[in-house]
């Protein structure tokens, strides 16, 4: 009771818009720094342990507050070159102020924390995070909204909890070719004074630009506009863009005239070049269209897949389910050794892309099943289809409990779990443990340098 009263008292001492000084003690899961002001917890994005900061309080809750950096009084030695970068300098890249070795250190700490607290495993050994070969310019897909600033067309990112665009001249994560194309496109659009979409009035043409690139330094351009039809003027400007940048192999115009935050329209019209660009992973050629799901950091994705497959005891001639398969990337790699792969994916276009890729690569022992994993897995079992093991790669929300129940019911010896959210991964590990399974191996993989995001690959085995 006394602690609660003390917290309330300290809480009342702070007000929104207060400017205070604080020293950061640690980085918590999610990537924000944590410090204490008169014993009251304050979370600060883009801050690092040993930073001494002047911050502005932006929100206050019962047990904590949040603030943004106004000034760095003394920079942590882990800041890049000790420069005093603040939140706005690397908007959208919440670890970019950290030296890369420190990014890896804190990502490991975050994984250890959730495994210890949520999964309840205090003694599991977590090896060093697998570093990315490319720590800048690794993204093969970028989407930026258009806006207007000082009578000039700009692109960038939405500011935190707002639809105001923060201008980015050169995105440090985007491929160099992607940055080059966006810069050239903005110059062309500004010369021709094309109107920009205003979500309040629902008027204006330009909504978003999407660039997809591949390892061969080829690009697909998708211009999203607020219209039900293509104008000749817009087409001419995009053809001009292609004349200036020969690496562009495909151009689409996406028609999106709805009052929505969804980026891509329902109608994507090819106006130049190929329907897709191609990417090669493990000697399998994948087609990438405007709506295709594909790993953002291809070099690191190859390494992640190799780790996941190596975790299996033996996949030769086995019947394997690739659950949440997307376009079936890892399923097709596994199919080279396995007897049969069932690739289950709820997004129909992803399943269709996978079927096309498998056919073009002569992979006949993979079957794409369009539907929810929890339902389709039951159907496979009810149809007496043999299942030796499963590889999971679910969305951030993790697995449905019914899926974990089904794994236990099948008495599978092992499953491999790829996760983009260590918190839900840890939760599911605990649920598996209640069904007689144990987390045997765990490898964290840095798919997204300069951000706090971290992926994990785990081997979950049935207890003997």
Curated annotation (Swiss-Prot):
Pfam families: TRAM, tRNA_U5-meth_tr. S-adenosyl-L-methionine binds at residues 295, 324, 345, 393. Keywords: Methyltransferase, S-adenosyl-L-methionine, Transferase. Residues 13-71 form the TRAM domain. It is an enzyme of class 2 (transferase). CDD domains: AdoMet_MTases. One of its GO terms (molecular function) is rRNA (uridine-C5-)-methyltransferase activity. SUPFAM superfamilies: Nucleic acid-binding proteins, S-adenosyl-L-methionine-dependent methyltransferases. Its EC number is 2.1.1.-. The active site is at 420 (nucleophile). GO terms for biological process: rRNA base methylation. The keyword Methyltransferase applies. The keyword Iron does not apply. InterPro entries: MeTrfase_TrmA_AS, MeTrfase_TrmA_CS, NA-bd_OB-fold, SAM-dependent_MTases_sf, TRAM_dom, U5_MeTrfase_fam. Belongs to the class I-like SAM-binding methyltransferase superfamily. RNA M5U methyltransferase family. This is Uncharacterized RNA methyltransferase FN1713. The lineage of its organism: Bacteria, Fusobacteriati, Fusobacteriota, Fusobacteriia, Fusobacteriales.
């Amino acid at each position: 009771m006394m602690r609660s009263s003390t917290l309330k008292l300290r809480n009342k001492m702070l007000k929104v818009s207060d400017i205070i000084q604080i020293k950061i003690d640690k980085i918590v899961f999610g990537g924000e720094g944590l410090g204490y002001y008169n014993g009251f917890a304050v979370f600060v994005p883009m801050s690092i342990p040993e930073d001494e900061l002047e911050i502005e309080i932006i929100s206050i809750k019962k047990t904590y507050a949040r603030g943004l950096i106004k000034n760095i009084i003394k920079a942590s030695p882990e800041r890049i070159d000790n420069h005093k970068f603040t939140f706005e300098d690397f908007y959208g890249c919440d670890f970019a102020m950290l030296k890369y070795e420190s990014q890896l250190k804190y990502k490991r700490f975050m994984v250890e924390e959730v495994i210890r607290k949520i999964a309840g495993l205090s003694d599991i050994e977590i090896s060093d995070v697998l570093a990315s070969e490319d720590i800048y310019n690794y993204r093969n897909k970028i989407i930026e909204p258009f806006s207007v600033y000082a009578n000039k067309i700009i692109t960038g990112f939405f500011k935190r909890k707002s639809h105001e665009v923060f201008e980015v001249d050169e995105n440090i994560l985007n491929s160099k070719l992607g940055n080059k194309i966006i810069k050239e496109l903005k110059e062309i659009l500004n010369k021709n004074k094309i109107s920009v979409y205003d979500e309040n009035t629902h008027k204006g043409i330009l909504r978003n630009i999407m660039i997809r690139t591949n390892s061969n330094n080829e690009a697909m351009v998708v211009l999203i506009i607020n219209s039900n039809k293509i104008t000749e003027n817009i087409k001419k400007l995009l053809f001009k863009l292609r004349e200036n940048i020969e690496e562009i192999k495909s151009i689409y115009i996406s028609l999106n005239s709805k009052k929505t935050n969804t980026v891509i329209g329902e109608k994507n019209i090819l106006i130049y070049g190929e329907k897709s660009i191609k990417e090669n992973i493990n000697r399998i050629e994948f087609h990438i269209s405007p709506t295709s799901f594909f790993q953002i950091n291809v070099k690191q994705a190859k390494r992640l897949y190799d780790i996941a497959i190596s975790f299996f005891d033996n996949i030769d001639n086995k019947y394997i389910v690739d659950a949440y398969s997307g376009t079936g990337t890892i399923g097709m790699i596994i199919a080279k050794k396995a007897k049969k792969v069932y690739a289950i994916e709820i997004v129909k276009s992803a399943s269709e892309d996978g079927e096309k890729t498998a056919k073009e690569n002569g992979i006949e022992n993979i079957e794409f099943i369009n539907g929810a994993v929890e339902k389709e897995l039951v159907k496979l079992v009810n149809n007496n289809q043999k299942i030796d093991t499963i590889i999971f790669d679910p969305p951030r929300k993790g697995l449905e409990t019914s899926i974990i129940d089904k794994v236990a019911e099948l008495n599978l010896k092992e499953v491999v779990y790829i996760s983009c959210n260590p918190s839900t991964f840890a939760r599911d590990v605990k649920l598996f443990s209640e069904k007689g399974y144990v987390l045997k191996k765990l490898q964290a993989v840095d798919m997204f340098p300069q951000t706090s995001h971290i992926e994990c690959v785990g081997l979950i085995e049935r207890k003997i």
